[in-house]
A protein has these predicted regions:
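WD40-repeat beta-propeller superdomains and closely related acidic/aromatic-rich repeat-like regions
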Residues: 1-384
């Protein structure tokens, strides 16, 4: 028997291009068809792009010139162009505050949007000015902190500052609701689509069978909470199931203190059947902030992003069974969101402009105080 071939060395993902943007973005998502990218912005709009694959350049084969005595001088090397462009489409408007949550329907060309004033809406994604399919301006009393869609596309789950977790049909009809004991910061569907997990201000995570109207197993993520003097500091930001629903991940921050919140990015892994915590990771120190988003790659690893103090951000690849990420990129500042293209070959990160030093920055020559903005960084994952 011949010896097995050694595993190919890991090749880090390659940044193809950073696409500029004039506003800060909270979240970005590729459509399931892969043809669109949408992002929720901090001025009450949804930004849209068409994902355009460039044709591969043709290669000219030069025939030998026997009469040439001297080789032609070498031309300066041109910077490599991105094989993909994000072509801007008109914004979607009619929202308030921050558009912090969006979700695509897994089959229909439909986008669901939630804002920080409590509005929930569904709209088409194609066309210059698509009209909403439906809107609910009072889906929650204030801030909708998280929006999730079931894998079968039948239901939406929302949670908010009003302590409610609500289940809706994707046609906008309220199906079930549960009032938690604290503000709810995250919600996600289990793969079968009939159960959700939600997590609150103090890091208590609960399973809820919304069809049977029954609460189920609880998980202790209280390390993602801190009572700092009179302030409850909430660190939970991300909930997601992996391994076909056998494992639940909870991500966010282990707060170091209140006020100007600092904390270390943290990720917890739980066994769903027993509620037992299996793993716990810290990705830096107090200035590094939060794990703000996670995407599951088909090859079994996670793509995580973090954001902390101005200029502090990480993109990481982590295998759930390992102690450390096998790839870390610190060149992209304050990563708010990550979305994996459906082909698994590319991902996009909504981040922050560099030199985003907040209050105290110098004015421009004409006396303007420039706000921050969120470039969208497009990466290509090398084939193994």
């Amino acid at each position: 028997m011949s010896d097995p071939k050694p595993a190919a060395p890991f090749v880090p993902p390659k940044e193809l291009k950073a696409f500029p943007n004039d506003r800060q973005l909270c979240i970005a998502r590729f459509s399931p068809c892969g043809n669109f990218l949408a992002a929720g912005a901090m001025e009450g709009t949804v930004r849209r792009w068409k994902v355009v694959e460039k044709p591969k350049p043709t290669v000219d084969i030069a025939l030998p010139d026997e009469t040439a005595k001297k080789p032609a001088p070498k031309a300066a090397k041109k910077p490599e162009e991105s094989p993909v462009e994000l072509v801007p489409l008109p914004h979607l408007t009619g929202f308030n505050g921050w558009v912090q949550n969006i979700a695509f329907h897994p089959k229909d060309k439909l986008l669901f949007v939630a804002d920080t004033w409590g509005k929930l809406a569904a709209t088409d994604i194609e066309g210059d000015a698509p009209k909403p399919r439906w809107e609910n301006a009072t889906a929650h009393d204030g801030w909708i902190r998280k929006l999730a869609i079931s894998p079968d596309g039948q239901h939406l789950a929302t949670c908010g500052r009003d302590q409610f977790v609500r289940i809706w049909t994707t046609a906008g009809k309220l199906v079930a609701e549960h009032r938690a004991e604290e503000d709810v910061f995250a919600v996600t569907f289990a793969p079968e689509g009939k159960v959700v997990a939600f997590g609150d201000l103090k890091g208590s995570i609960t399973m809820w069978d919304f069809e049977a109207k029954q609460l189920g197993r609880k998980f202790d993520a209280s390390v993602l909470h801190k009572l700092s003097r009179l302030q409850n500091v909430a660190g939970l930001r991300v909930l997601t199931f992996i391994d076909g629903g056998k494992t639940l991940l909870a991500g966010g921050c282990e707060p170091a203190g209140g006020g100007f919140v600092e904390g270390a990015p943290a990720l917890l892994r739980f066994d769903v059947a027993t509620g037992k915590q299996l793993s716990e990771w810290r990705f830096g120190v107090a200035k590094d902030g939060f794990v703000l988003d996670a995407a599951s790659h088909p090859d079994g690893y996670l793509v995580l992003v973090t954001s902390g103090q101005p200029g502090s951000g990480k993109i990481m690849f982590l295998r759930p069974g390992e102690k450390e990420p096998f790839f870390t990129n610190t060149a992209v500042a304050n990563c708010h969101s990550v979305t994996l293209h459906p082909d698994g070959k590319r991902f996009a990160v909504a981040a922050m402009n560099k030199a985003s030093n907040g209050n105290g920055r110098q004015l421009t020559k004409d006396g303007q105080y420039l706000g921050n903005n969120s470039p969208v960084h497009l990466f290509e994952i090398s084939a193994a």
